[in-house]
Amino acid sequence: MTTITHRYADVDGFKVFYREAGPADAPTLLLLHGFPSSSHMFRDLIPRLADRFHLVAPDLPGFGLSDMPSRESFAYTFDNLANVIGRFTEVIGFERFAVYVFDYGAPTGLRLALAHPERITAIIACFSPGGP
């Protein structure tokens, strides 16, 4: 049985909830959810991959259990979501990782990949709109 831990990371004062499973020394895969969902959407996928991958599935800002600041205090743009998730990967110690993007997670993940291509080992796109 796969153990999935639930954690929070403080990203520059912003609380990001995430699910984590798999061996820390395995290849890392960042799972970015769609709209209007959360990391909970990966509840069936994580156990299927956790024997081979280190999996981390955050709730994007404003979704799930992550902080949801007002629109007046936080710009809910894909650029800003990518900045928060990029910092999130730094805070939790990711150096290089693959990114799995789904739907709304695609513009976020693709922007992250464009900003830091040296950190991205692969991009897996599922039901994703075109372009960053």
Q: Each predicted region: which residue ranges?
A:
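Conserved hydrolase catalytic core segment
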Residues: 48, 52, 94-132
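A structural signal for well-ordered alpha-helical scaffolds and beta->alpha junctions
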Residues: 2, 39-42, 78-82
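Active-site loop/oxyanion-hole signature of alpha/beta-hydrolase fold enzymes
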Residues: 9-12, 19, 57-102, 130-131
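Short, flexible active-site loop motifs that bind/organize anionic cofactors or intermediates
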Residues: 32, 71, 109
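Short, hydrophobic alpha-helix immediately C-terminal to the catalytic nucleophile
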Residues: 43, 86, 110-114
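Conserved HGGG/HGGXW glycine-rich cap/lid loop of the alpha/beta-hydrolase fold
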Residues: 14-68, 88
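N-terminal cap/lid segment of alpha/beta-hydrolase-fold proteins
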Residues: 1-15
